[in-house]
């Protein structure tokens, strides 16, 4: 947390979300934030299933005696039995088919001769836990705005087509736009009126093609 007015942990939001029928939750933040509030997640029965690291093209460092921070954590939490939680594993189209040659083994290791085989694993592969994608630096409408290309696969993973996603801190509306682009409905909550107006204007423009969405996660 910093001294910035919008950089605050809002007490009670985990309880409010837990009171709904929501079973999946993606949460962005620093490791420090998650450690400081671990008991609050546990008290509201949110269990962590996995973590994603968003590696940005640039970073920031508030301290000269620490490493330069170029990443952000994205943790997935769920409630209830894991078997009943909707999940649609996401893929990226960057697997590469390859041909490998096997060398003949020396006699003392057994009689396995040389050979050649081709693996046909080109095409889609599971989304990696480290996602490299440019931040919105220089283009952002909100200090913590996320790229659509990062949010879209996270939404598709936790919500079936046509379902409603809720962003209780929607900022300029990136998650809401990503939800619409992926065939979902969306509800956003934003306490800062200027950002709420930006989000409303953004969604009213009915953007179906977005330059940010073209950035593939890799």
How does the language model describe each region?
Residues 1-7, 84, 144:
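Short, exposed beta-strand "edge-strand" segments with a Pro/Gly-rich flavor and a Y/T-containing core
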Residues 3-58:
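Conserved Class I SAM-dependent methyltransferase catalytic core
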Residues 45-218:
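Class I S-adenosyl-L-methionine
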């Amino acid at each position: 947390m910093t001294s910035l007015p919008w950089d605050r942990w809002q007490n009670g939001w985990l309880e409010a979300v837990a009171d709904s029928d929501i079973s999946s939750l993606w949460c962005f933040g620093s490791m420090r934030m998650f450690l400081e509030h671990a008991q609050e997640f546990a008290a509201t029965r949110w269990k962590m299933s996995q973590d994603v690291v968003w590696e940005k093209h640039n970073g920031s460092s508030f301290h000269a005696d620490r490493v330069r921070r170029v990443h952000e954590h994205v943790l997935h939490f769920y409630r209830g039995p894991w078997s009943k939680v909707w999940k649609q594993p996401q893929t990226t189209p960057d697997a590469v088919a390859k041909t490998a040659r096997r060398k003949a083994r020396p006699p003392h290791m057994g009689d396995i001769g040389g050979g050649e085989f081709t693996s046909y694993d080109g095409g889609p592969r599971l989304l990696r836990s480290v996602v490299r994608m440019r931040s919105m630096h220089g283009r952002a409408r909100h200090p913590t705005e996320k790229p659509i290309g990062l949010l879209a696969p996270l939404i598709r993973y936790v919500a079936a087509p046509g379902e409603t996603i809720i962003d209780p801190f929607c900022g300029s509306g990136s998650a809401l736009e990503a939800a619409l682009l992926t065939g979902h409905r969306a509800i956003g909550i934003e306490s800062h009126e200027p950002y709420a107006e930006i989000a409303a204007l953004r969604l009213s423009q009915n953007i179906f093609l977005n330059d940010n969405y073209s950035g593939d996660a890799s």
